[in-house]
Amino acid sequence: MSYLLISYHIQEMGSEGLSKLSYSEESRDRQLLDLKENLGAKELFHLATCNRVEYLFHTDNLEELLENINTSKQLPLDTARFFSSKESVVQHLLEVALSMDSMIFGENQILGQLKTAYQESLKFKSLGPQTSGLIQEILKHAKKIRSEPKLRNIHTSVATVAAREFTERGSKTDKILFIGAGETNQLAARYLHKYG
């Protein structure tokens, strides 16, 4: 039994490259289950944020999974980061959960996105006991680390940093237009409403 984590980051792929790895909400579950089956993986966890896409596979045969990934051409390999030891997978996912490699160091939205991705993966039954247990441990340890006194009071996200910057530089009469109803825009709007 082995893990394989394939990670794509905006630094290597750019936003256009990452968008090619995104799935519509309507088809995501089916496409991910098809990917899992086509590659011969036992379990699959998928996380997509604005700066990264992560695929965590659990398999009985790592060599076969790698061969299937290589021949299927379903995932680009030239811009991917690979983690195959359990230790490297855990370290990478913990760094992701703690936003150590994000636009804003320590950004608190990523942990919530990881939890949501976990719940969605449970819902469409792509997880099994191995991957589910691993993600639960990552969430538990990340929450524990985030609750440390020095980290607990840091409320950082791209949205709050941008909104804070706007309130410091803009005037009270400046008009703002939000395009899109995504989580980042909603958070920025709440922050500006509260403090602007």
Name each model feature, range by range.
Residues 36, 163-167, 189:
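Generic structural signal for well-ordered alpha-helical scaffold segments
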Residues 77-172:
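Glycine/serine-rich phosphate-binding loop and adjoining beta1-alpha1 elements at the start
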Residues 1-102:
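A glycine-rich (often HGG/GG-containing) alpha/beta subdomain
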Residues 19, 150, 176:
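Conserved short-loop catalytic and cofactor-binding motifs
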Residues 55, 105, 179:
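Short glycine-rich loop/turn motifs that provide flexible caps or phosphate-binding loops at active sites
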Residues 169-196:
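Glycine-rich phosphate/diphosphate-binding loop of Rossmann-like nucleotide-binding domains
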Residues 61-65, 110, 184:
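Short phosphate-engaging motifs
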